[in-house]
Swiss-Prot record:
Pfam families per the UniProt record, alphabetical: Acetyltransf_2
Coiled-coil positions: none
Residues of the signal peptide: none
The name this protein goes by in its record: Arylamine N-acetyltransferase, liver isozyme
Length: 287
């Protein structure tokens, strides 16, 4: 594994001699704009190994993406190599249908400490408009505006909660809007976490379980999403979506199209720079 090869993969050629916030922000943004959040392996007959060398080979050498445990694991390795004070944390994602956080940890995120201040860095929550674009200062109750919207942490009795203020979608004629629950109000809860450091091996069982559990969104939907300079692309099953943030003062532009199987393959190559070794079986089960 080679840090320069990783820099090339994310198209980063800036200075990295200082493990500071400016460099962290640059690496993070290059990472999320080059490495898709995707679960395509489980929909084309591949096994996902939570092993650093396997993750490196998949994402850096084969130019694939990965789900949270892969893309954040790679980012953890890179930042560690660069000299950052960093640790892995475990998160419990919010399930809107159940109006509750999951009982078990099902997400990986990273905590970076710079000059005594802690920042949360998460490159693996990219299946929609909830991917942060900047490292988030670990402070409770403070709005942290970013291009995708306003994020904030709320801390309660040692548990931290990440939420985002929703923005309106401007949907041109002929497009189909993303589904959401209007009764949930203006705030979208994302996940909870504690500051207890984790080891990557703590997620081996989860990594294996998510590949076979029948009722998870990862089984029900083939997902590939990538942040762009002004929004994101998302391919869910046969539905391709493109969002541009702040298209209007109070709304983001959302355009969606339905693709054929052949167009799915072409879109993966053209929009996400992904060429799969095995045949993808697109999936998009509602609910």
């Amino acid at each position: 594994m080679n840090i320069q090869e990783y820099f090339s993969r994310i198209s980063f050629d800036g200075s990295h001699k200082d493990a500071d916030l400016q460099t962290l922000t640059a690496i993070f943004q290059h990472h999320i704009q080059a490495i898709p959040f995707e679960n395509l392996s489980m929909h084309c007959g591949e096994t996902i190994d939570l092993d650093l060398q396997a993750t490196y080979n998949k994402i850096v050498k084969k130019k694939r993406g990965g789900w949270c445990m892969e893309t954040n694991y790679l980012l953890f390795w890179a930042l560690k190599e660069m000299g950052y004070d960093i640790c892995v944390l475990g998160g419990n994602s919010y399930e809107p249908a159940k109006k509750a956080y999951t009982d078990e940890i099902n997400h990986i995120l990273l905590k970076v400490v710079i000059k005594g201040s802690s920042y949360i860095v998460d490159a693996g929550f990219g299946g929609g408009p909830y991917q942060t674009w900047l490292p988030m200062l670990l402070i409770s109750g403070k709005d942290q505006p970013q291009i995708p919207g306003i994020f904030r942490f709320i801390e309660d009795n040692g548990i931290w909660y990440l939420e985002k203020v929703k923005r309106k979608h401007y949907v041109p004629e002929g497009s189909v809007p993303l589904t959401d629950n209007p009764e949930m109000g203006n705030i979208r809860k994302l996940y909870s976490f504690t500051l207890e450091p984790k080891h990557i091996d703590d997620f081996q069982e989860l990594n294996a379980y998510l590949q076979v559990a029948p009722d998870t969104i990862l089984q029900k939907k083939s997902i590939c999403s990538l942040q762009t300079t002004d929004g994101f692309y998302a391919l869910v099953g046969w539905t391709f979506s493109e969002m541009k943030y702040k298209y209007k003062e109070d709304a983001d532009l959302l355009q969606t199209t339905t693709l054929t199987d052949e167009e799915v393959e072409k879109t993966l190559k053209d929009k996400f720079n992904i060429v799969l070794e095995n045949k993808l079986i697109p999936v998009n089960v509602r609910g």
